[in-house]
Structures are given as C-alpha cells and as structure tokens.
Amino acid sequence: MVLYFTGTGNSRYLARRIAEGLEMPLYDLNACIKAGNTAPVQTGRDVVLVTPTYAWRIPRVVSEWLGKTALTGAERIWFVMDCGSEIGNAAGYNRQLAVQKQLKYMGTAQIIMPENYIAMFNAPQKEQAKGIVEQAEPELQKVLTQLRAGQEFPPPRDNLYDRFMSGPVNPVFYRFFVKADAFRATGACIGCGKCVELCSLNNIHLENGKPVWGKNCTHCMACICYCPKEAIEYGKKSRGKPRYHFEALERKQQDV
C-alpha cells in the first residue's frame, strides 16, 4: 500500500504515480489525520510512505500518526520524500521509525519537487515549476524500478551538516518557526471556507466569514497556496510571492 501526506499536492502526485506503477492501493493520510482516525490499516506486506520534508524530516504529524496506528500485515517500508532542495539526515530517523513499527527498513529516496514553503522561501512560477516536475521524472522512474524489484533504496547523503539539520535544528525549527500566528486573511477573502476544508489539523475556523487560525499548525501551506483569491498572507514574508499547488500545473497542461 502507498500511504501519503501532502501539503500542496507534490506528495499526492508522486504517491499516485507510484501506486499506479505498482498497482497498489493509495491511502490518504490527510483525511485520516483530519478525522482523528487511528484505526488499524490493512496495508499488506509492503508499505511505501510518501511525504514532503518538514524541517529536514518527515512531517511530525505523520510520525505521530504512525506511532498510534497499526499497519496490519506490513513487513517492509520504503520512504519517498519530496523536497525543495534537501532532506538532511531524514533517513536516520526513518530507520528508527521503521524499527519502532517492527518493519524492515528499505531505505529513503529523495525527489526534488517545486518549493511551496512561502513562509520562508519563494515558490517558483508555473513554467519553472513545470520544469522542476519534468526534471523529477528520471528519479521517479528509478524509484519505481527499485520498488518493483523489491530492492532497498541506496543510502542518501549523510554528513555532519545533514545530521545537524535533521537533529538539533528540527525541534528548534518547530518551536520557533512552525506557528500559525502570522497567517491572516486580507480584504480579498470571500469566506469560501476552502482553507478550513483543507487544514488536516482542524486548525482553522471561520468567524464572521473570515478564517481564524489556532495554535496547532504544521506549516503545510495548503491554506495560503490553495486560496482561490490569494487572500491569505503569512505576515510580510509571503507578500508578492507566487502561490504554488500541483493541481494548478495540471490545469495549465490541460489548457495548452
């Protein structure tokens, strides 16, 4: 089974491609986490977990969900992580997670996809994003070949910098940067509730037709990037930046 968590669609796209290529079922962790569902999941022998990279590891909400949820029938697990640039030493923590789940760790693969973290970085324009997705195709095909053969992924880069970013920096990053207090709706907001619907942590609700954010945020960027009116800002950091979600690329390809 292919399990995935996504912020703005990159991981969903990769998970869908992997599930189709392996003829395996696809399991949406966003819906599961939003519903608070930790019932056992009948996965079968092989599990592929596809996630974005948050602070140089898999998202904390995903590792917490896995800690509470039995993967019935699972014996082996592969991790596929998409990122804007690097995953640090995420593989070391993925190995620990596999051991905790009593699963054979089959490795971690990194796939570069378009950046979406506009709370800190710039997202690409659509044409540039499309090019990044095209450049990811050879790595995705390599991942599919290894998965079909039941092979372990080769070890990713692991140096002192990687261990530092995934180690000491990760909890510090969550503590000081992963907060919702800078999100706000502008006058362009139409109160459609899209952000409420998309928030996997149920951290957004509408008051007087405008979104209000709570304190349980994972910085997935779904609310700000999927807003149909681009009416959400993250303080001053997101001003003037393009919004990115994968489905906009698919629509652009269909329009051509």
Language model features with spans:
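FMN-binding flavodoxin-like domain, especially the glycine-rich phosphate-binding loop
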Residues: 1-2, 6-14, 20-32, 39-51, ...
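Short secondary-structure boundary/hinge segments and terminal tails
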Residues: 35-37, 116, 235, 244-245
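Conserved short-loop catalytic and cofactor-binding motifs
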Residues: 50, 82, 128, 186-187, ...
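Generic structural "secondary-structure junction" signal
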Residues: 56, 113, 208, 234, ...
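A mid-sequence, solvent-exposed acidic-amphipathic segment
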Residues: 159-191, 197
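Iron-sulfur cluster-binding cysteine motifs and their immediate structural context
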Residues: 184-185, 190-212, 216-218, 222-239
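Long, positively charged, glycine-interspersed low-complexity recognition regions
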Residues: 230-256
